[in-house]
Amino acid sequence: MAFIWRRRSTTIVKLVAFALAIWFCIAFLVYTDDTRRRAAQEGAGASGAGSAPGVGGGAGGLGDPIALALRNEPAGEDFGINGNVIGGGGQKQAHDEADIPPTVGKHKADLQAERMRKKAAEQPKKKPQEDSKKVIDPPANFEENPGELGKPVRLPKEMSDEMKKAVDDGWTKNAFNQYVSDLISVHRTLPDPRDAWCKDEARYLTNLPKTDVIICFHNEAWTVLLRTVHSVLDRSPEHLIGKIILVDDYSDMPHLKRQLEDYFAAYPKVQIIRGQKREGLIRARILGANHAKSPVLTYLDSHCECTEGWLEPLLDRIARNSTTVVCPVIDVISDETLEYHYRDSGGVNVGGFDWNLQFSWHPVPERERKRHNSTAEPVYSPTMAGGLFSIDREFFDRLGTYDSGFDIWGGENLELSFKTWMCGGTLEIVPCSHVGHIFRKRSPYKWRSGVNVLKKNSVRLAEVWMDEYSQYYYHRIGNDKGDWGDVSDRRKLRNDLKCKSFKWYLDNIYPELFIPGDSVAHGEIRNLGYGGRTCLDAPAGKKHQKKAVGTYPCHRQGGNQYWMLSKAGEIRRDDSCLDYAGKDVTLFGCHGGKGNQFWTYRENTKQLHHGTSGKCLAISESKDKLLMEECSASLSRQQWTLENYDSSKL
């Protein structure tokens, strides 16, 4: 029995020991699992604080937070489009990490990291990290750093509904592809478009003046505005920049309020000026100039990118002659892909205008080319585009800055161009300076003014600066000048400065411009068939060239029905000529070689005879199409009257 008891005791001890071992294992596993679950719950609570309801860490980060980003709206009162981590991350204050891109699908679950972030926020402000790249990370299959070296960013054709909405919202609000912009670094690299001639530092003076850079904006997209400013800071010698003055023309988007101030608080050269009401570009620029202190003012639009070496060539010209106004070559940044397009100095154009007082680009005239040994040398330009230029501050003041009676924008570039040349200055385009600009096909901004702003500004311009040549603009608007306000102070300015005449300007600065007064006829071209109420009608401009010219009921208001018959037999709409090559009658750039653009008006039969084809211009029975027919003097559909026809000018 003792033996049996001893065996049972040993077995019991073993069973108890085994049971204790199992209990300890179970207790350890339960404790570990509970710890993990509690940590995960705490982490989820921390990370969920910055997430939009119902948004998880979706692939590509294309949920609501991106839609917020593309709408330029913050997730909270003081948090802008950089205030959320896309895909469900913790909030970060915009002024701490405003240019650090949200990371798709990465959760900040560590509470210690959150405490460290809050502690860091209490420390003195530091400059935002310079390796920041973009606001949103690219979708799958995108290169890591899209848009570098100015390369295009092309979105996939197949997009999720969320992504498509975000893209569409960006286009609607900005008239360019904001979604693509938000994929690209605000410090992206660009190609160097300069000729070798430009890179010789010995060409530029060493004691160049400082400039204040004035950038006016209204509801500009976050990344585009930041990229503009950083391109100035990153590619300009620090000692040549006085201040970068950001003039807010009464923006109402939240990301342009405290978020913008917090971001640029780390950059002492950047100053933000707020307009107290919507002023428009012209008066916003005047406001910026009033806050400038440096000897040179440089104006840039808020959707630009400066390239390497852009500034020194501009300042050099002003340092040599303070009455020289200089413009960089304006390269095109695609509104869709943000690709940076540029051309070498041989392809540089100069500014002009037409008698609608609209700015236009033209090749450098042969007379100007002969003045230079290199195509990279600065060239005279009759006018400037107006958005990007540098000017001596005292000379700008002497010229009366901008006409404060101009509203919003339009015409200010021609006014400054005319008075620069007529009042003792020169206007140049500098091929060694390149700045990219996003050209939009429409304006995303709305004004409540019932006034035709462009016409009002243009009439003020014509009344002050164009002398007797103003009549050619008035013909284009049917002599309906409207209310242009009081220009007596601007006329006094011109008299006080003893400026030259507009005829001097045309003869010496822009002799290439066709003068309507030299034409044989100018005004409407009316067909006498089918009631005699149909006129030749076509919009001008390069984008309308090579399209069939149409007809429209005569309205006697100029515009698309204002034509000129030159002594050379051209039927002109400014720089476009009526052209017939055997198919449709179209507008084509005037080439001066007669041929397809040579027309003769037969006054006795009232026919327009085409030189190379031998046919006559007619209209269809439906009165909506031009025809070319075998000439027959008896057909009224081939008969035309030309307004202000004067055969003595032939």
Curated annotation (Swiss-Prot):
Biological processes, Gene Ontology terms: protein O-linked glycosylation; sexual reproduction
EC numbers for this chain: 2.4.1.41
Enzyme class, UniProt record, top EC level: transferase
Catalytic activity: L-seryl-[protein] + UDP-N-acetyl-alpha-D-galactosamine = a 3-O-[N-acetyl-alpha-D-galactosaminyl]-L-seryl-[protein] + UDP + H(+); L-threonyl-[protein] + UDP-N-acetyl-alpha-D-galactosamine = a 3-O-[N-acetyl-alpha-D-galactosaminyl]-L-threonyl-[protein] + UDP + H(+)
Glycan-carrying positions: N321, N373
Description of its domains: There are two conserved domains in the glycosyltransferase region: the N-terminal domain (domain A, also called GT1 motif), which is involved in manganese coordination and substrate binding and the C-terminal domain (domain B, also called Gal/GalNAc-T motif), which is involved in catalytic reaction and UDP-Gal binding. The alpha subunit loop in the ricin B-type lectin domain regulates substrate specificity and modulates the substrate access to the active site. In isoform A, the alpha subunit loop is composed of positively charged residues and acts on negatively charged substrates. In isoform B, the alpha subunit loop is composed of negatively charged residues and acts on positively charged substrates.
Subunit field text: Isoform A forms homotetramer. Isoform B forms homodimer.
Organism: Drosophila melanogaster (Fruit fly)
Lineage start: Eukaryota, Metazoa, Ecdysozoa, Arthropoda, Hexapoda
Recorded family membership: Belongs to the glycosyltransferase 2 family. GalNAc-T subfamily.
The protein, known as: Putative polypeptide N-acetylgalactosaminyltransferase 9
Region called Catalytic subdomain A, residue ranges: 208-317
